[in-house]
Amino acid sequence: MKNEFPLKGLTAYPELEGSRFHELDPRFQRHIQNRTLRCIVILKDTHPQVKFDVFERLNSGATKLTPQELRHGLYYGDLMALATRAVKESNFLSALEIKNDKRMKAEELVLRFWALSESHDKYKKPLATFINDYSDKNRNLPQKRKDELLKNFTRILTMAKDTFEELTFKVFNSELKVESTFNSALYDAIMVGFYKIDKEGVELKATGDKAKKLLGTLIETDDKFRRSISIATSDEAQVRYRAEVIRKTFRA
C-alpha cells in the first residue's frame, strides 16, 4: 500500500511481476484494499502437532524443509542437541554412507531409534507424529537421562556395525549380494531388536559372516519380514513384527 514492496512469485497474472501498488490498474488496487488478510495465531500452549501442521503447510518455498528440519525448529532443546551430538560422536554418517547431512536425516534416525526403543509396544502411526510427540515430551532432559540416551544409541549402533560390518542396514540376499543400500525400516528393526536383546542381558547368536548369512537368508526366504521392510513400513503391525523377528533370530 505504501509502494515499498514489488509483487513477486506470481502464478496468476505473471505480467504484474515486479509491479508496486501504485503501478497497478485501479481495479487491482481496489481488490487488494477490500481483501481480508487472514492470520493464524500460534500461542505458547497450542498443541505441538497443530504447530507442526501449520508450519508444514506454510513450507512451500523453493527448497522445502524436511520433517526433521521442522522438528528441529519447533522442538529444539536438550533432545535435539543430543541427537546432533550422537550423530557426531558415533560416526553415524559412515554407517549411512553419507558425506554430509545438511537435511538432518541422521538426526531423525537417532530420534526414531530413541522413540521406538522406549515405546515400541505403544507405537501409533504416522511415524512422523510419533517422533514429534516423543520430541516434545523429551525436549528438556536431566543430565543422567541424556547420558543414558547417548549411551544406548552408541552401544546399539556399535553392536549393529560389529555384527554386519559393511552390510549394516543394507538389504541383501543369502549370497550377500546387496539389493539396496540403506533401508530405514531395516535400520529400526535391527536397532530396536538388538536393543531388546541387550536389555535382556543376552548375547547375540552370531556376528560377522555367520550373522550376514542369517540376515540375508531371512530377507530372502521370509516374505512377511521382507514386506515389513518394503511395503507400508510405518504400519503398527509392520513396525512391531520386524523388530521382534530380528530379536528372535539373533537372540542366543
What residue ranges belong to the model's regions?
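Basic- and aromatic-enriched surface patches that contact anionic nucleotides/nucleic acids
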Residues: 1-133, 212, 219, 224-236, ...
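C-terminal subdomains that position terminal phosphate/3'-OH groups for nucleotidyl transfer/ligation
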Residues: 110, 114-252
